[in-house]
Design a protein with these regions (language model features):
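Conserved helix-loop functional segments at active or binding sites
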Residues: 52, 225, 262-266, 351
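Active-site loops and adjacent core secondary-structure elements that bind or stabilize anionic groups
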Residues: 1-197, 212-230
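Gly-rich Lys/Arg/Thr-decorated short loops/hinges at beta-loop-alpha junctions or inter-strand turns
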Residues: 22-34, 107-113, 187-206, 283-305, ...
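Flexible, glycine/charged-enriched surface loops at secondary-structure junctions
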Residues: 56-64, 162-165, 228-235, 265-276, ...
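C-terminal binding/interaction regions
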Residues: 71, 115, 119-120, 133-163, ...
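Glycine- and Gly-Pro-enriched alpha-helical subdomains that act as flexible
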Residues: 71-110, 240-342
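Alpha-helix N-cap/helix-initiation motif
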Residues: 35, 39, 212, 245, ...
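Histidine- and/or cysteine-centered catalytic micro-motif in compact active-site loops
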Residues: 68, 122, 236, 244-247
Length: 390
């Protein structure tokens, strides 16, 4: 197939809309549904991300995309009992690719509502069954088992978007886009992110475990496909906070750090002990948890309101309890798509348990940034590579 025609572009008034190749066939096939313009943008960006993660780590990878940025990305590592609980994972053994997607979606379940899923490996029954219970717009993968395809074709009254990508496809060396009738050209960003980029450790502490290296790679690869400016927090092979599309670096660091804090607070014993009413929908449960751990907790705990969500009225999770729980976070990695201009980014990252930093370096205040990292015994690598994405 040489072209596809979505119903419209980014908005319903933007017609006509078309996807095409200058030469040859499109490297993808729509197996079910009718993806829209933004769906395809999410699909192609997310596929590049998971493909790069698989290449860099050798592990199955998955991503959950919304509006051309990842809400989460993860590697296919086993789920702990706590993770199974907070991500609503089914009991029993799960395939690595299913674990990857469950973790990717679990990074920020509110932002993943209505997501586009991407898998580095063939979609299997485990992954399809989990997706079937979630609110999602579509999926891209290099293949599907018969069982998975049957499950996915039954989602959204048969309209769920399923796209298969040719894993051998390599884009042209020059990419083009038009803005306001003017054509822009640039070289395709084929930068290979690997462990060689992590060799320039500029802090006094230079100890990097393999897990820390993998987390740095995950952070950097996620940033490569996130709208800039962006900062990404990672722990144990999954993103836990992505701050995308901000105009200042510190706002990226704060936004992503706040998301990381929320991810960690979802594991607080009080949250794990919440007793929800029977047959509550997953999105309603996600929203209730998000409000419960926020400063607006009365919105779900007020008399006459909590009964709609909980069997038993929960105790308030106090500010002191939240601060004490967040203070226990450790072993977190943060990556930045451009240099940290001031040490304040390191100070904010530390509050969310950051121990490892990967950033390009190159600020006129690098000495201040390094000194701040040294103050907390952090390990910081200067990659020398900027990762802007627009």
């Amino acid at each position: 197939m040489k072209e596809l025609e979505p119903k419209y572009g980014c908005n319903p008034n933007q017609k006509p809309a078309r996807l095409s190749m200058d030469q040859g066939e499109l490297p993808l096939e729509v197996l079910n549904g009718r993806p829209g313009y933004i769906n395809f943008m999410d699909a192609l960006n997310s596929w590049q991300l998971v493909r790069a993660l698989k290449k860099a780590t050798g592990l199955p990878a998955a991503a959950s995309f919304k509006h051309v940025s990842p809400a989460g990305a993860a590697l296919g590592l086993p789920l702990s009992d706590v993770e199974r609980h907070i991500y609503f994972a089914p009991e029993g053994e799960l395939s690595p690719i299913a674990c990857a997607y469950i973790r990717a979606r679990g990074a920020d379940r509110l932002c993943s509502f209505g997501d586009w899923a991407a898998l580095s490996d063939v979609c299997d029954g485990d992954t399809a069954r989990f997706l079937a219970a979630e609110v999602s717009d579509g999926i891209i993968a290099p293949g599907y088992t018969d069982e998975a395809l049957e499950i996915l074709r039954g989602k959204r009254k048969g309209g769920y978007n399923v796209v298969e990508i040719d894993p051998s496809y390599t884009p042209a060396p020059i990419e083009r886009r038009s803005i306001f009738g003017i054509t822009f050209e640039q070289g395709y960003n084929d930068l290979d992110i690997n462990e060689e980029m992590l060799q320039n450790v500029v802090t006094e502490n230079k100890e990097l475990s393999q897990q820390a290296k993998n987390d740095m790679l995950l952070s950097l690869i996620t940033l490569k496909y996130t709208q800039s400016n962006s900062v990404c927090y990672v722990k144990n092979g999954m993103t836990i906070g992505v701050g995308a599309g901000q105009q200042s670096r510190i706002h990226c660091t704060r936004l992503a750090g706040n998301k990381a804090d929320i991810w960690w607070l979802r594991q607080h014993p009080k949250v794990l002990g919440l007793q929800f009413v029977d047959k509550i929908r997953r999105p309603d449960r996600d929203n209730a948890i998000d409000i419960y751990i926020s400063d607006e907790h009365d919105d779900v705990l007020a008399e006459g309101v909590w009964q709609n969500t909980f069997k038993v009225k929960p105790e308030v999770l106090t500010a002191e309890e939240k601060a004490a729980w967040i203070a226990q976070m450790s072993g977190v990695t943060v990556g930045s798509d451009a240099f940290f201009p001031f040490g304040d980014n390191v100070e904010r990252a530390r509050k969310s348990g950051v121990q490892y930093i990967a950033q390009p370096g190159g600020s006129i205040r690098d000495d201040q940034v390094i000194a701040t990292a040294n103050k907390y015994g952090m390990v910081m690598a200067f990659t020398g590579i900027r990762l802007f994405h627009h």
